[in-house]
From Swiss-Prot:
InterPro entries listed in its UniProt record: Mur-like_cat_sf (IPR036565), Mur_ligase_C (IPR004101), Mur_ligase_C_dom_sf (IPR036615), Mur_ligase_cen (IPR013221), MurD (IPR005762)
Signal sequence annotation: none
HAMAP family per UniProt: MurD (MF_00639)
GO biological process: one example: cell division
Domain of life: Bacteria
Name this polypeptide is given: UDP-N-acetylmuramoylalanine--D-glutamate ligase
Amino acid sequence: MRIGLLGFGKSNRALLDYLLENGEAEIFVSEEKRLDDDTKSYLRKCGVDFEEEGNTEKLLDCDVVYVSPGVKPRSDIVKKLLAGGVNISTELQFFLDRADKEKVIGITGTNGKSTSAALMHHALSHRGLKVFLGGNFGTPAVEALREDYDYYVLEVSSFQLFWCERPRVSRFVLLNISEDHLDWHSSFKEYLNSKLKPAFFQEEKDTFVYNKNIETLEDLSRVKPKKIPFWTEDTFVEENRLVLQGKSFPLPGSYPLQMKENILAVSVLYNELFGDVEGFLDSLRSFKPLPHRMEFLGKIKGRSFYNDSKATSTHAVLGALSNFDRVILIMCGIGKNENYSVFIERARPRIKHLIVFGEIYRDLRPFLSNVPYSIVSDLEEAFRKALEVSEEGDVILFSPGGASFDMYENYAKRGEHFREIFERYKKEEGES
């Protein structure tokens, strides 16, 4: 059988290694971008045929093509593959076809899915279980096939799920849904359907945990598994209390709104698995939040700085803003074809001053007539401007609302740059 790998990012690289280890000899790699010399040397050494700087019809000779999650479904090469009757799949589906599905936990949502997956992994590990954490976050799922685990905790994205034919997981968590990735998906409905797909492949013995506040959820009567909603009258988080099925538990700290939702969703599933809320809360005490997600950096001249570089959509920015009264907000990056009029209308009461740079300014500009704002050229200038327009006691929030790729390799590099600038200014001010 001839296997094609369309795109050679992290997931397909991991899949290639697994295929080679298991004796699959006829593999063809097709990458739209230029491959680095080390990668080409490795492929030649392994006897793998490849092409770079474009995807050609050579892929049509493959029996199955595993698509990197970032490949858009309406790209020319995908259209040709579909027209040619080539079976299209993805690395996540490859894993699910071979793993013990009773052990797989899938977590998705527009915001909070990485942190929730990490929290679920931490809570299970705290219980003494051997747990794999990966998927869209961190390690590709296929890596887990080399060992046996008690549980596989996977963050799954809409891109991955779109390409999956039958993504069944025994436990599935849907955190939230809002407009996102409309530069990739053809419509919000397609995005929503991708996010929901695992629920429709679950069996009656499985569990589906979901946010009751998602207004766009369709009728779930066709969903077979046990359905457990959160944000209900008896299952919610309020201030520093977790309430599960009417029973109240004190949280071990104060958390931003999105983190509260993450805690709520994970606690619901954990309680369903073990009936041990106290055990979950005990694990929460030692959980370290992921960087670049409402990360408090410290203070300079009495101003509080927050790094929320992971916020790549306006929905995520609104979530960050909800933690404060009025802030100095820094936005940048590439917009995702969202409704920016509605965003500004909802965000305006919480914005003292907006500082913006990058491509997203074009999206925001028509709606800024009643918002005090400044246009800058880069993050360094944005930081200086934020100090200039703020006063002691203000919050300076870096929550970009757009993808990073216009100026940075990824959101993490962008967040690291913001942190570096903060540390430099803090040192210059002589503050500890």
